[in-house]
């Protein structure tokens, strides 16, 4: 086991603070509308230019082991904020630094670290309650666009495109971000349920100009097995021929005689029909067939629940307004299922998402939920160069997370104003002693740090801006974008409540623990030159006889 170096007391705290400051100072230059970018060197590819706090934090590793420990703990704050709310990583880092700096000063002055931490925790609990009281619901499209714009570094085009996407696919809908091919951002919306299975035979195509199958007001037959015998399908096909409506068959597979007969009937115009494979595999396929059944108001014909295909009637079939099938995808638009059953299915899947531990399973469940709830939107980010593309894509993803957080828990005035207002209301938190009281003061002072940093990054005097905002009331704050004061909500400067709450809670949690540090242990770095002993010289060979 390698030898360890142990440092105690003030020496430990000073070195830890140095690491905190290096990381936080690199991250906090990105805060606010006039925040700067940070360039990150990559071992392969071009350097990454970013204004995303957590991306900067993740790149930082320090040589000094003790400084690095401080930096890694603050990195954890940014990562936690990113995981929970998807945004607010820079705010969380600024708050953590402010609490650590003030807290370590108090410890150096002889105050009890544990009481300081308890005071900070009490202040944060009170602050979170006040934040929730200050929060307003974010319901309309305009507010969603404003939140997304602020999070995307005041880029209105990103705000608008996210608001439009949310409007089209609903709050439960899936919105994905991809790299586009054009210079401008584009939005593709797939309404209805789409799954990645195309037609089983090109002879089903009835729209040669687009190479697709389009069925208007079709019946939908869902079968959880392979169909190879046409006799099983005859009762359904005979019933359909009388109605004159088209049929979509979704089965594990349709092959041999059954597929050939369907193709012939379709080409002769006896029955308008198309067949596709069911999406997914195993249990996921069963679940997705059930989703389609609920969406279209049909029943899955499965032998394991005692239903046989030969005995199926038209009442077992689902219906939809329209179905479009291409070589690779099938889209069911406006299924005629009951809304109450669809809503129940969505809430059931939502429950599974919460219980699932696998990221892959969560993603697949959320996709299923979105397809039932409304559709899928794809934002294609446009840019002139690859470097700009990466930076812009990261901003769009941040804005999307912020918007989801805003819809979930509402919004508060942005620009650091919410925390300043909250701090003024919780000054009288109940404490047991003077040290705890000072812990509360540390937390209240730290709550001003984001506003001060936004002002500093905008080239203004932080104390002047902070005092002006503190002397105001309600939503009055500082708009760093155009250097004016006014009502933040009216100016459209909003922060999601969840983002602000998570930033404060995670910053206080980790910074509070750092204040209570009394000793640090790290491996002593070994120099390579010391590890390798020099090889002894070879003695000369004796003369040969």
From Swiss-Prot:
Its main location: cytoplasm. GO terms for molecular function: ATP binding; ATP-dependent protein folding chaperone; isomerase activity; unfolded protein binding. InterPro entries: Chaperonin_Cpn60_CS, Cpn60/GroEL, Cpn60/GroEL/TCP-1, GroEL-like_apical_dom_sf, GROEL-like_equatorial_sf, TCP-1-like_intermed_sf. It is found in: Cytoplasm. Keywords: ATP-binding, Chaperone, Cytoplasm, Isomerase, Nucleotide-binding. It catalyses: ATP + H2O + a folded polypeptide = ADP + phosphate + an unfolded polypeptide. GO terms for cellular component: cytoplasm. Its EC number is 5.6.1.7. ATP binds at residues 30-33, 51, 87-91, 415, 495. One of its GO terms (biological process) is protein refolding. Forms a cylinder of 14 subunits composed of two heptameric rings stacked back-to-back. Interacts with the co-chaperonin GroES. Belongs to the chaperonin (HSP60) family. Together with its co-chaperonin GroES, plays an essential role in assisting protein folding. The GroEL-GroES system forms a nano-cage that allows encapsulation of the non-native substrate proteins and provides a physical environment optimized to promote and accelerate protein folding. This is Chaperonin GroEL. It comes from Shewanella baltica (strain OS155 / ATCC BAA-1091).
């Amino acid at each position: 086991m390698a030898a360890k170096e142990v440092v105690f007391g003030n020496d430990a705290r000073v070195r830890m603070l140095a690491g905190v400051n290096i990381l936080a100072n690199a991250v906090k230059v990105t805060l606010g509308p006039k925040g700067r970018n940070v360039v990150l060197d990559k071992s392969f590819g071009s350097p990454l230019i970013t204004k995303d706090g957590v991306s900067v934090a993740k790149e930082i590793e320090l040589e000094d082991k003790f400084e690095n420990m401080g930096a890694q703990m603050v990195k954890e704050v940014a990562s936690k904020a990113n995981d929970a709310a998807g945004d607010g990583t820079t705010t969380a880092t600024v708050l953590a630094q402010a609490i650590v700096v003030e807290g370590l000063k108090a410890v150096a002055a002889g105050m009890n670290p544990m009481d300081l931490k308890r005071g900070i925790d009490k202040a944060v609990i009170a602050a979170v309650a006040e934040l929730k009281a200050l929060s307003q619901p974010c319901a309309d499209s305009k507010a969603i666009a404003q939140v997304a714009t602020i999070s995307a570094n005041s880029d209105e085009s990103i705000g608008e495109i996210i608001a439009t996407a949310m409007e089209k696919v609903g709050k439960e809908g899936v919105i994905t971000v991809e790299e586009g091919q054009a210079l401008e951002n584009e939005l593709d919306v797939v309404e209805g349920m789409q799954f990645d299975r195309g037609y089983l035979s090109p002879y089903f195509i009835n729209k040669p100009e687009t190479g697709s199958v389009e069925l208007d007001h079709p019946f939908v037959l869902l079968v959880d097995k392979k169909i190879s015998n046409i006799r099983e399908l005859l009762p359904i096909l005979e019933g359909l021929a009388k109605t004159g409506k088209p049929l979509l068959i979704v089965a594990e597979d349709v092959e041999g005689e059954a597929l050939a007969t369907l193709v012939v009937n379709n080409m002769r115009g006896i029955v308008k029909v198309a067949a596709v494979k069911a999406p997914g595999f195993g249990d996921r396929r069963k679940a997705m067939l059930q989703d389609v059944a609920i969406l279209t108001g049909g029943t899955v014909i499965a032998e394991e629940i005692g239903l046989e295909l030969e005995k199926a009637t038209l009442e077992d079939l689902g219906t939809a307004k329209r179905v479009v099938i291409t070589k690779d995808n099938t889209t069911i638009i406006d299924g005629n299922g009951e809304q109450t059953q669809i809503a129940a299915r969505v809430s059931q899947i939502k429950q599974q998402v919460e219980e699932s531990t696998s990221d892959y399973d969560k993603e697949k469940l959320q996709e299923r939920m979105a397809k039932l709830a409304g559709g899928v939107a794809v934002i294609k980010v446009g840019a002139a160069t690859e470097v700009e593309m990466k930076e812009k894509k990261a901003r769009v993803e941040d804005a999307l997370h912020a918007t989801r957080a805003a819809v979930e828990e509402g919004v508060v005035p942005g620009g650091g104003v919410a925390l300043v207002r909250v701090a003024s209301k919780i000054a009288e938190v109940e404490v047991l002693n003077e040290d705890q009281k000072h812990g509360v003061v540390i937390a209240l002072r730290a709550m001003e740090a984001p506003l001060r940093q936004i002002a500093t990054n905008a080239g203004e005097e932080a104390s002047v801006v902070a005092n002006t905002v503190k002397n105001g009331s309600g939503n009055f704050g500082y708009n760093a974008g155009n250097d004016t004061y006014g009502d933040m909500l009216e100016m459209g400067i909003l922060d999601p409540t969840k983002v602000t709450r998570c930033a404060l809670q995670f910053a206080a949690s980790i910074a509070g623990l750092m204040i209570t540090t009394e000793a640090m242990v790290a491996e002593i770095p070994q120099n390579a030159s010391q590890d390798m002993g020099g090889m002894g010289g070879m003695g000369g060979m004796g003369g040969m006889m």
